[in-house]
Swiss-Prot record:
Annotated positions of the Phosphoserine modification: 524
Gene that produces this protein: Ppm1g
GO BP terms: regulation of cell cycle
Entry protein name: Protein phosphatase 1G
Enzyme class: hydrolase
Protein species of origin: Mus musculus
Length: 542
């Protein structure tokens, strides 16, 4: 489920727009970090992708924010660059664009950009750190060797005297055979453990600082927009369990200790030979002991294999785009056509005469079609609905750890970036649509969200003006926010939602007002309009 804050971050990134002149589409959006330690959602609100097309989208990142932000920044242009888009084939263009941006995430240039977004060190920086660490170790070893070279035998015996006593055979087992030996004695036997060489606990995965969104508030223009300011109370945490695992501990061994360890092993082998006779006399052979140890090792290895299967990130690359990814639901509006592409469990819903019409399909690993593809690619779905015990989605952009079957095309991998496409011809019955991440849909159904918005969209504020759409979204986010994190995680996720009206808001305003207007007000308004019209006619005749 990921880590949570002690108190939710309810700071919201919100905005409104009226659409482009040729395609008036009033919209409002809001995004909130909530209980999560970081914000991994992103979105696009682009009223004028081109002269006749608008684009609205939501990306729900996992394992970090980087892939979601990258998609928000580049996917609009990648869609427009597709050959099918230029030919007017929007469905094909969306499918090609999803696969194209997914493929770009494996290139070295994009991986570096993702690492910068995520705040992860690049390979070059890692190499520099390793070289610096090795230099420090070399300097320490040189100083130690120089010091010991100038010491007398008595001083050396004093320093390593505790290691010079012969250990009885029956108490020796296990000494000097550990994976992390301490300083070696003069006779080659292992000394006491050095606290500084204890195996460190597993480090957290790469941190990811949260942002409140990535949007375009411009009413005109085709760029994806700029990154919004981070909200307060942002946190840091490793990748969630759904897509990545903690890093394996790494312990550097100096050559000085390795050489000493080799000498210790030779001495121990000779002593082990002398111990075999005494063990045979007791009726318990070393061969039997070795067989038992082999069986134990086999059982431990099998347990380790199971653990690695449950945490796939341990074997995959720990780099952005491999252990992180994002859902994507993209809606294009051109004329009366609505085309929605979806990969993952974010969702687009249209209100049709007050009824919720799902324009996307949630992709879950346990679904029949998804399960068949996962198994065909060599994967499995665990009882809790996770692919190989990791990701609880079956389609996403990124997550290339799950896309390594070289015998299959990208769309047939365990996790596929190929979106489902739905098309709708808009009519007067279609009032608005909602695009949101699963932070909303896990709490409320499609119909519940439509009903909630329907009850608010005609409300007026204290000045008699229709409510801003963003204020309705903000209220929806607060409605979905869990009071605490004691439950199953419902209401504790990041939340991003966009409302897009298919009609200008002034039309909605007139419809809402007509039911409340008094007869006298209506007559006076009509009289004023007639006077204005007659004046215009006189002016024309003059």
């Amino acid at each position: 489920m990921g880590a949570y804050l002690s108190q939710p971050n309810t700071v919201k990134c919100s905005g409104d727009g009226v659409g482009a002149p040729r395609l008036p589409l009033p919209y409002g959006f809001s995004a909130m970090q909530g209980w999560r330690v970081s914000m991994e959602d992103a979105h696009n609100c682009i009223p004028e992708l081109d002269n006749e097309t608008a684009m609205f989208s939501v990306y729900d990142g996992h394992g970090g924010e980087e892939v979601a932000l990258y998609c928000a920044k580049y996917l609009p242009d990648i869609i427009k660059d597709q050959k099918a888009y230029k030919e007017g084939k929007l469905q094909k263009a969306l499918q090609d664009a999803f696969l194209a941006i997914d493929a770009k995430l494996t290139t070295e240039e994009v991986i570096k950009e993702l690492a910068q977004i995520a705040g992860r060190p690049t390979e070059d920086e890692d190499d520099k750190d390793k070289v610096a660490d090795e230099d420090d170790v070399d300097n320490e070893e040189a100083a130690l060797l120089h010091e010991e070279a100038t010491m007398t035998i008595e001083e050396l015996l004093t320093r390593y005297g505790q290691n010079c006593q012969k250990v009885p055979p029956h108490t020796k087992s296990g000494i000097g055979t550990g994976d992390e030996p301490g300083p070696q004695g003069l006779n080659g036997e292992a000394g006491p453990e050095d606290p500084s060489r204890e195996t460190p606990s597993q480090e957290n995965g790469p941190t990811a600082k949260g942002h409140t969104g990535f949007s375009s508030n411009s009413e005109h223009g085709t760029e994806a927009g700029q990154i919004s300011e981070p909200g307060t109370a942002t946190g840091e945490a490793g990748p969630s369990c759904s897509s990545a695992s903690d890093k394996l501990p790494r312990v550097a061994k100096s050559k000085f200790f390795e050489d000493s360890e080799d000498e210790s092993d030779e001495v121990e082998e000779e002593e082990d030979d002398s111990e075999e006779c005494s063990e045979d006399e007791d009726g318990y052979s070393s061969e039997e002991a070795e067989n038992e140890e082999d069986e134990d090792d086999t059982e431990e290895a099998e347990e380790d294999d199971d653990e690695e299967m449950m945490v796939p990130g341990m074997e995959g690359k720990e780099e952005p785009g491999s252990d992180s990814g994002t859902t994507a639901v993209v809606a294009l509006i051109r004329g009366k056509q609505l085309i929605v592409a979806n990969a993952g469990d974010s969702r687009c819903v249209v209100s049709e005469a007050g009824k919720a019409l799902d324009m996307s399909y949630d992709h879950k690993p346990e679904d029949e079609v998804e399960l068949a593809r996962i198994k065909n690619a060599g994967g499995k779905v665990t009882m809790d609905g996770r692919v190989n015990g990791g990701l609880n989605l079956s389609r996403a952009i990124g997550d290339h750890f799950y896309k390594r079957n070289k015998n299959l095309p990208p769309q047939e991998q365990m996790i596929s970036a190929l979106p489902d496409i739905k098309v709708l011809t808009l009519t007067d019955d279609h009032e608005f649509m909602v695009i949101a991440c699963d932070g909303i849909w896990n709490v409320m159904s499609s119909q519940e969200v439509v009903d909630f918005i329907q009850s608010k969209i005609s409300q007026r504020d204290e000045n008699g003006e229709l409510r801003l759409l963003s204020s309705i979204v903000e209220e929806l986010l607060d409605q979905c926010l869990a009071p605490d994190t004691s439950g199953d995680g419902t209401g504790c996720d990041n939340m991003t939602c966009i409302i897009i009206c298919f009609k200008p808001r002034n039309t909605v305003e007139l419809q809402a007002e007509s039911g409340k207007r008094k007869l006298e007000e209506a007559l006076s308004t009509e009289g004023a309009e007639d006077t204005g019209n007659s004046d215009k006619k006189k002016a024309k005749r003059d």
